Amino acid sequence: MKNTKLMLLLAVVTLTAVSCGSKKETPKEEAPKMLVLYYSQTGNTKAVAEAIANKLGADIEEITMVDPYDPDFQATIDRCKKDQEQGVLPEILPVKADIANYDVIFLGFPVWFGTYAPPVTTFLNSADFSGKKIVPFCTFGSGGLESSVKDLAVAEPGAEILPGYGVRAARLEAMPKEVDNFLIANGFLEGEYVQLADFPVQHEASADEAAIFDAAVDGYPMIHAKAKTVASRDLPDGTEYLFTAVNLPREDKPDMPTDEIQVYVTVEKDKAPVFTKVIR
């Protein structure tokens, strides 16, 4: 009897051991390692970079010039133009972060002359982003995210360029909320985000809609245009308009193109119209 009980106990132990031995744990998928890398002259792009890094808990590093630009805006523009004419790029200090150790790189820059600032070009010329995911983000006076992304794709053909984020320097106060929405919408953060409807087909701009356009761009020297057609969609706290406008001739800048541009304008409740970006 004792032998029978012992044999039964051994059988149970053996079955349990086999059962435990055959059980497989599902390996946890490792979170992608992320780096926020940016160049900033005035601090605007730095503010966006820090907001992204803080939200994601990502590493962060600044691209720094050996001979920084003058804080004066016009002096910087003059130097950039001279460097462009001479085919010269600014020298930068070595970046400490090893790109090879990261899966996703958030690359930030101010937009100058329709693309990323020259120090970023210098960095891209020496960096290898093959097999990496790049998330561009930028600050600008009127626009340039779309054109910068095109240039980035040409400069780094081995990388996957993901959707980017851009904000006007004049609208930096809206950035924290927009960054949250951007990171959630693109799967970098968990949470709920506002998914906007597509714009409907544009129609000829009415007098009232043209007045909204004029009010939004009033005082901005780089936009001298007339609203042609428009579409609109609802925002949680107002309305967003997408205008197609025609650049008008300018006596002070006869070389300015007179082609069509797209201008995004938001009108929040009880606030004046503000343009958010221009696509040329």
Q: Which residues make up each language-model segment?
A:
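Short, conserved loop/helix-junction motifs that constitute active-site signature segments
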Residues: 54, 99, 125-131, 155-156
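C-terminal helix of von Willebrand factor
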Residues: 168-191
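Bacterial N-terminal signal peptides that target proteins for export
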Residues: 1-7
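C-terminal motif of bacterial Sec signal peptides marking the signal peptidase cleavage site
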Residues: 16-19
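Compact beta-sheet-dominated globular domain cores
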Residues: 159, 199-207, 253-280
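N-terminal beta1-alpha1-beta2 submodule of the flavodoxin-like/Rossmannoid cofactor-binding fold
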Residues: 24-107, 114-116, 121, 210, ...
